[in-house]
Amino acid sequence: MAFSVQMPALGESVTEGTVTRWLKQEGDTVELDEPLVEVSTDKVDTEIPSPAAGVLTKIIAQEDDTVEVGGELAVIGDAKDAGEAAAPAPEKVPAAQPESKPAPEPPPVQPTSGAPAGGDAKPVLMPELGESVTEGTVIRWLKKIGDSVQVDEPLVEVSTDKVDTEIPSPVAGVLVSISADEDATVPVGGELARIGVAADIGAAPAPKPAPKPVPEPAPTPKAEPAPSPPAAQPAGAAEGAPYVTPLVRKLASENNIDLAGVTGTGVGGRIRKQDVLAAAEQKKRAKAPAPAAQAAAAPAPKAPPAPAPALAHLRGTTQKASRIRQITANKTRESLQATAQLTQTHEVDMTKIVGLRARAKAAFAEREGVNLTFLPFFAKAVIDALKIHPNINASYNEDTKEITYYDAEHLGFAVDTEQGLLSPVIHDAGDLSLAGLARAIADIAARARSGNLKPDELSGGTFTITNIGSQGALFDTPILVPPQAAMLGTGAIVKRPRVVVDASGNESIGVRSVCYLPLTYDHRLIDGADAGRFLTTIKHRLEEGAFEADLGL
């Protein structure tokens, strides 16, 4: 029986894919779920696994051909259909004849992963990992075919456009088949693997011979060269070296990290994405003291030199954009195309806030366990203003011509991470005090940088704040996060000479701490006067500086 290999749906809006490389040639034998061909879309590069075991009898789409979703890529025939091509396949089985008993067992194992698949085996499905997440990419399998697993034991790592997480096993048993290989993209509800419950897997010893058709395990030295090609870079590290996924290798290359010096924290010492990010952060810190020693009195220059060592190796090269960079590119372009954006900027005198923070920060840090930055003050002022101006905390539906006015303030915060820009959301931020906001902001920013965000923390925002002043910028023109109607930038707080008016109306020149607040808003919903009133409310709240009660002063 022949099986058609078709271009799968590799994303919500992906309609086609381009064949980049065939991993098998016509006449080659393939196993079920063995990587067959590499394809590229505008969102992801991935490998397409074989839908059946057999022989690749015909390649229909050549390399560099673009094929629509559902279009035919190749044909897989079973050994009988393949004729001469099938002959080499049986020869591999007799090659293992010194162990005459295990040799007959591999064929039953393949059906075992297929037979229970129909009724006895429990499918492991791609779960919903967020409000608007429709698919996930397999980063790394934590178990191999034949391994025993417990209920809720981590089985596979997956990545979405919002979060990386581990999928637990839904039942206890044995992993009998893997349906989605590493780097494969699977829609929500799609099958990742199958678990045979312990009672159904009477052939518990079968896992030992089973790996022979699948060239993964280390027991047979001759089978090892087969898995080496996917991990070509670590191949020189001998048999005991842990497997490194393409995603991790790419991340290491982007950050100029030598994987030989990275200690893996994954199962069996495997190097995970978090290990590479931690090594990159450690490398950055190690290089930071040099500029600090030369200009100890000026903390600001520490930040600019740090990115240079990590990115210097990119000069003169062409690199594939990371997943987050591709998502950012698409989302920002779509935002500008779908909304009518413009930006209004107000200057704010932050002198009182600067004084309050200086008086309270030591006691605040001791009491709350986090540093008191300026961001909680901005967030509190924004929340108060959103409650007064509900047309800013709203969204416009172009299709239904309706405006939704939200009854809660879900604040997003733009966070610069090693992977790229993320905008995690503090839900119901309007219910938090200044101290509560400080703790929540510190927590969500730290988890965004370490990759430990929950899926729902990257969606559902009604308004976003971006701290453009963290790198010294005075003002910017933020790009909206649809369906949000506005985003506020907070510029660097700098000292400037300003006209100061006393209670009697007398004017003088004084040194004041000021910053700029640029507000980007959707003109389909918000007029310039609305934006001005909203910014004026924030300005008055900050210049008044009445936060003593929040700070215990």
UniProtKB/Swiss-Prot annotation:
It catalyses: N(6)-[(R)-dihydrolipoyl]-L-lysyl-[protein] + acetyl-CoA = N(6)-[(R)-S(8)-acetyldihydrolipoyl]-L-lysyl-[protein] + CoA. Its cofactor is (R)-lipoate. Pfam families: 2-oxoacid_dh, Biotin_lipoyl, E3_binding. Disruption phenotype: Cells lacking this gene show severely retarded growth in vitro, and display no PDH activity. They are also more sensitive to nitrosative stress caused by NaNO(2), and to macrophage-induced killing in vitro. They also show at least 20-fold reduction in survival in a mouse tuberculosis model, and are unable to cause disease in a guinea pig model of tuberculosis infection. Disruption of dlaT leads to high up-regulation of the expression of the bkdABC operon. It comes from the Bacteria. The active site is at H523, D527. Residues 2-77, 121-196 form the Lipoyl-binding domain. Binds 2 lipoyl cofactors covalently. The modification N-acetylalanine is found at A2. It is an enzyme of class 2 (transferase). Residues 101-110, 206-232 have a biased composition (Pro residues). InterPro entries: 2-oxoA_DH_lipoyl-BS (IPR003016), 2-oxoacid_DH_actylTfrase (IPR001078), 2-oxoacid_DH_E2_comp (IPR050743), 2-oxoglutarate_DH_E2 (IPR014276), Biotin_lipoyl (IPR000089), CAT-like_dom_sf (IPR023213), E3-bd_dom_sf (IPR036625), PSBD (IPR004167). Inhibited by rhodanine compounds. Some of them almost exclusively kill non-replicating mycobacteria in synergy with products of host immunity, such as nitric oxide and hypoxia, and are effective on bacteria within macrophages. Keywords: Acetylation, Acyltransferase, Antioxidant, Lipoyl, Repeat, Transferase, Virulence. The modification N6-lipoyllysine is found at K43, K162. One of its GO terms (molecular function) is antioxidant activity. PANTHER family: DIHYDROLIPOAMIDE ACETYLTRANSFERASE COMPONENT OF PYRUVATE DEHYDROGENASE COMPLEX, LIPOAMIDE ACYLTRANSFERASE COMPONENT OF BRANCHED-CHAIN ALPHA-KETO ACID DEHYDROGENASE COMPLEX, MITOCHONDRIAL. Forms a 24-polypeptide structural core with octahedral symmetry. Identified in a complex with AhpC, AhpD and Lpd. Part of the PDH complex, consisting of multiple copies of AceE (E1), DlaT (E2) and Lpd (E3). Component of the pyruvate dehydrogenase (PDH) complex, that catalyzes the overall conversion of pyruvate to acetyl-CoA and CO(2). Together with AhpC, AhpD and Lpd, constitutes an NADH-dependent peroxidase active against hydrogen and alkyl peroxides as well as serving as a peroxynitrite reductase, thus protecting the bacterium against reactive nitrogen intermediates and oxidative stress generated by the host immune system. Is the only lipoylated protein in strain H37Rv grown on a standard rich medium. However, in a DlaT-deficient strain, another protein, BkdC, becomes lipoylated. This is Dihydrolipoyllysine-residue acetyltransferase component of pyruvate dehydrogenase complex. It comes from Mycobacterium tuberculosis (strain ATCC 25618 / H37Rv). The lineage of its organism: Bacteria, Bacillati, Actinomycetota, Actinomycetes, Mycobacteriales.
